[in-house]
Amino acid sequence: MYEKEIEELQKIIDDSSRIVFFGGAGVSTESGIPDFRSADGLYHQEYKYSPEQIISHSFFLRYPEAFYEFYKDKMMYLDAKPNPAHLKLAELETAGRLLAVVTQNIDGLHQQAGSKKVYELHGSIHRNYCMKCGKFYDADFIKNSDGVPHCECGGIVKPDVVLYEEGLDQNVTQRAVMAISMADTLIIGGTSLVVYPAAGFVDYFHGKHLVVINKSETGKNVNAELTINAPIGKIMKGIRV
């Protein structure tokens, strides 16, 4: 299955030396982490508040208990393991073929797979800081805390993830844009490209090959040299580095 698509992608990868991968939630669903927008994703489940409300800056400040109840249960998957897509991208970087991974995910699975140059547009569950004194806490501290995690100084610990109503980290975005603009091949995977401003990043690509691998269609399919509607792990698994 997908032999023809894998073969076409292989030709493009063999012709590339500066690949950048731009990925979203679909990259991690094969590791057992639900996405937000698919039919069985978080937006289609019933909650007292919508996910957009809960994971917003103002909601976090007003209702930290409700925020953390949702966040720990629905956004922290500490047992998840990298899948073939994460592993193959790390291999491509080690082989000197991949410049960077630009991800909308917050799970840290790319780094767990061995990727070094990862630009996390929406932050990471693995970085958490006290809002009062700035002390760092890891994901285990958050997950194992009772209710709202507090620092030893008494301040509330906040995850370093970009909530609704918050801006992206300018340092990260600049590096991501630079990598995309330097790429000879851009592989877009596991994202429907509906989250802005992150989705607008791909407009900075002016290289040779644009590839889209996603289970459903995306807004960028039109310009793609190769479009594969399939789970990304199954495709990347068949690639030779």
Locate the predicted segments by residue.
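Conserved catalytic core of sirtuin-type NAD+-dependent deacylases
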Residues: M1-V241
